């Protein structure tokens, strides 16, 4: 009998930071509040990397959303499930602002988050979108 697929997400500090940042981004969007408010409301301390990622995505949201809209072709950004949209935003932010993180790592982490929190199909969608976007923003 095959073993269930183990997620690679959460295997290290950076992976955990990405996951927590996506949760904060999703909550902020769902509640129509700033991500800084979500961070302030946390009982447990928020790691610096989590705050940097979540706040950075919020600052670059217009730019990331333009890229998502451009590369999603037939889908409007609002039609993309909220969790997938926020995973894409985080990954695109990293592609643009964190040149120290290899493209393959950014894409793999995003795909794993999509598979874990959305659907297998979302993982494929995220992979295709980010592969195309990476060719544009990481020349």
Name the predicted role of every residue range:
Residues 1-123, 127-139:
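N-terminal interaction/assembly modules
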